[in-house]
Amino acid sequence: MAPQQQPSSIPTPYEDLLREILETGTPKGDRTGTGTTSLFGRQIRYDLSAGFPLITTKSVHVKSVVGELLWFLRGDSNVRWLQENGIRIWNEWADENGDLGPVYGVQWRSWPTPNGQHIDQIAGALETLQTNPDSRRNIVSAWNVSELDNMALPPCHLLFQLYVANGKLSCQLYQRSADMFLGVPFNIASYSLLTHMFAQQAGLEVGEFIWTGGDCHIYDNHVEQVKLQLSRDARPYPQLKLNKAADMFSYDFSDIEFTGYDPHPVIKAKVAV
């Protein structure tokens, strides 16, 4: 059984979902051969105006979160830039030259069209926020079916939609495959940061970040780590200080600072490849 939830005024939707998976999930096999406990179709929400959702029940490597997002926004698909900045989270999937194929950043910035052109989805999304904020078509997708076989790993977090109401920007992410212990805290933080960037560039306030998961799973070799995490009380979320860059593609590490981040110690676990 999972540890009992400790009373707290701090919203903990991520930890609540971890607990639900442990208590009610279904044992399933998986591609990696590790084994999981899984639930299908869950959603968690964060009010971005109330604090930045950087998980506090364990320490999240902030530089990797920021660096990976900047790398996506560069349209890059080689791990060299990540490695030069001390980030190794993609090493296991790269080939001998550091290439990953046409993964996230390539699809975001350079989606190929049948006539040989390319679409910059990020630039298009920002333009839509600025010119037609009520659009229901403001979607960015990394799930390019024609190129999946050329990717080192098909996109797990594959599609996000932007929504404006009352001058506030919200973002909903759909994640088909959710490694709840290792991956999802990164994804929540990454797309929350991206939402702040879009809002800043479009002259909007931030609203909600909504995470929607398909196969939400805890790997069998992460169960003890999850139980340890759930035994900890959540601490207040940090605040984000974001210097405004010239455009969406000019943000740098120095523009992004989290203040008041005081997490519990890191909990190590092996990534399933």
Curated annotation (Swiss-Prot):
One of its GO terms (molecular function) is thymidylate synthase activity. Keywords: Cytoplasm, Methyltransferase, Nucleotide biosynthesis, Transferase. DUMP binds at residues 31, 136-137, 176-179, 187, 217-219. One of its GO terms (cellular component) is cytosol. (6R)-5,10-methylene-5,6,7,8-tetrahydrofolate binds at residues 61, 179, 272. The keyword Transferase applies. This is Thymidylate synthase. PROSITE patterns: THYMIDYLATE_SYNTHASE. It comes from Corynebacterium jeikeium (strain K411). Its main location: cytoplasm. Pathway: Pyrimidine metabolism; dTTP biosynthesis. It is found in: Cytoplasm. The keyword Methyltransferase applies. Signal peptide: none annotated. NCBIfam families: PRK01827.1-3 (NF002497), PRK01827.1-5 (NF002499), thym_sym (TIGR03284).
